[in-house]
Amino acid sequence: MVRMMIRRLSSQASRFVQPRLLETGTLRIALINCPNELLFCCERGFSTFSDRNLSYRDKLSSGLVGIKADDAVDLFRDMIQSRPLPTVIDFNRLFSAIAKTKQYELVLALCKQMESKGIAHSIYTLSIMINCFCRCRKLSYAFSTMGKIMKLGYEPDTVIFNTLLNGLCLECRVSEALELVDRMVEMGHKPTLITLNTLVNGLCLNGKVSDAVVLIDRMVETGFQPNEVTYGPVLNVMCKSGQTALAMELLRKMEERNIKLDAVKYSIIIDGLCKDGSLDNAFNLFNEMEIKGFKADIITYNTLIGGFCNAGRWDDGAKLLRDMIKRKISPNVVTFSVLIDSFVKEGKLREADQLLKEMMQRGIAPNTITYNSLIDGFCKENRLEEAIQMVDLMISKGCDPDIMTFNILINGYCKANRIDDGLELFREMSLRGVIANTVTYNTLVQGFCQSGKLEVAKKLFQEMVSRRVRPDIVSYKILLDGLCDNGELEKALEIFGKIEKSKMELDIGIYMIIIHGMCNASKVDDAWDLFCSLPLKGVKLDARAYNIMISELCRKDSLSKADILFRKMTEEGHAPDELTYNILIRAHLGDDDATTAAELIEEMKSSGFPADVSTVKMVINMLSSGELDKSFLDMLSTTRASLK
C-alpha cells in the first residue's frame, strides 16, 4: 500500500505549491513567498541577530537554539547572498534549528527558496521537510516528498518512516500507520523503540488503550524492551477514562519489567484515583511512592489536596498542606485556592479567610479563582457587604474582577431580593469592559421573573438576543417559567413553538414547565395531551415527570386520570417513590375515598416509604373532625413518619 501511495504521490514532489503562511507572520516572513528581487531589497536593520560584522558561518556557529522567525529569515538571506553559496549542510543546520522552534511553515518556505536558487535538496533536507509536512497535517505532501527521495535513488531510513508514522498517528490514521510498519519491515528496516512509542501514542490518542497494551506485550515477547516513554500515554489515557484499576496493574507490570518510574507516573495514577473517588487508594499510593524514594512534588500534593477537598474532606486536605510545608515544599496559588474553595463550600468562611491571609503572608498572590470562591461564599450567606469588600480588596491587589465575579455578585443580589442592585452592577460591568454572558442574563431574567417584574425580564431577554449572546436551554426554561407563573401562557406557547421548530435539543424539564403552565391556566386536558405525546417526540419520561403530572391532575380534580397515570408509571418501569404515594393518598382522602387511600398506604409501606408530614397532618385533622377513625392513624404510624 505504501509503495502505491509513494508512486501515486511522487509526481507531486517536483511541483508542490508551498501553502500560504499563517496570517499572523511578520512582513519579513510574508516576503518569503514574494519574488526574489523583493525579498532581497528588504530593509534588514531591525533584527539584533543581523549583525553586519558577522558572516553567516559565525552566526551558524554562534548557536541557533530558539531562533526567532525574523532572525532566521535574515540569516537565510545572508546565506543566499554569499558567494560562493553555502553547502546544503549549512542550510540544513538552519532548517533543523527553525523546525525545533515549531515554525514548520517557515522551514518549508525557505526550502522552496533554496531549491529555486539552484541548491539541490539532500536526503536530510527532504527528511526535515517530511517532518514539517507531518506537523502541519499535510500528509499528502509528506508522502509526495518520500516519493521524491526514492526517485532520486535514496533509500528512506527508519527516521523517515517513524516521522511518517507520527504524522499518520497525529491524524488518527492508526490502521494506516500499522500497515506502514509492515511495509517498513518488508523493505528491510527493523522497527526501533521510537517506532513502538509512536504507535503506542497513536493508539492511545485514538482511545485504543487495550490495543496499545497488547502491542507492548507482543514487543516484549519478541525481546523488545519498552521504556518509561512507552508507558506514559497508556497510563494517561487509562486514568483519564476512569480505568485506574488497569493503571495500577500496569504500574506493577512496569515494576516487574524494571521500567524507570518517577514521581510523574505516580502522580498520574494518584490523580486518576482521586477523580474516581478512591481517595484512600490514592493516599496509599502516595505513601508507597515516598517509601520507594520518589519525592512528591507540588503537583502530587495539589492533586491529593484537590481530591480530598472535592470529596468534602477539607480537614485531610488541610493536613496535607501542613505536611508539605513541613517538608519544605512551598504551596502555590493552586494549593491555597483549592483549600479555600473547599472551606467555603463547607460554610467555613472564617477558616477560608484565615487561609487567604496566610497565603498573602507567604507572598503568594491570590488569583481571580481564589477571590471568586470567597465572594461566592459571602453571597451565599447573604453577607453582601463583605462580598463587596472582598471585591475592593481584589482590585486593590491588582486582580481585576472577571465575568465570574460579576455573575456571582449579581446572583447574590438576586437571591437577596435586591434585583435593582443586581441590574445596576450589570450596567457597571459593560463600563469596565466585561462582557455579559448567558449566565449573567439568565440570572437577571430569573430574578426579575421571580419578583414579578416580567416586563423588565422580557426586555433583558430581548437585549440578550440583540447583543448576540446565545440563549441556552436554561434561558428558555427561565423565561417560559416566568411567563407561565405570571399568567402569560399564550406568549409562553408562542415562544415554545418556535423553540420546538429550532435545532435546540429539548429535555423533559422544559416540557414540564409548559405542562405546569397549562394546568395553572385550567387547561388540564391540553396538559394531559402534551404529556401523553412526549414519548412520540422521543422525550424520555422519568419519575419526577410522572410525579409532576400526577400532582397537577390531583390539584385540578382529575383524580381518575391521576390513578391511570400512576398504574401506567409502574407498567413503564418507573417505580413510584415517596412523593408519588403521598400525593395520591392526600388526593383520595380529600375526595372522601378512605378505602383507596388505605390501599395506597399499605402499598407504600410494602415499598419501604414513609408518610410525609403533610399526609400525617391531614390525617390528624380528619381524625379531629371525625372524618376518619383512629385505626387509620395506627396504620400510618407504622410507616415511620415523624409527627414532629
Curated annotation (Swiss-Prot):
PPR repeats lie at residues 87-121, 122-156, 157-191, 192-226, 227-261, 262-296, 297-331, 332-366, 367-401, 402-436, 437-471, 472-506, 507-541, 542-576, 577-611. It is found in: Mitochondrion. Keywords: Mitochondrion, Repeat, Transit peptide. InterPro entries: Pentatricopeptide_rpt, TPR-like_helical_dom_sf. PROSITE patterns: PPR (PS51375). It comes from the Eukaryota. The keyword Nucleotidyltransferase does not apply. GO terms for cellular component: mitochondrion. Its main location: mitochondrion. Residues 1-53 form a transit peptide. Belongs to the PPR family. P subfamily. This is Pentatricopeptide repeat-containing protein At1g12775, mitochondrial. It comes from Arabidopsis thaliana (Mouse-ear cress).
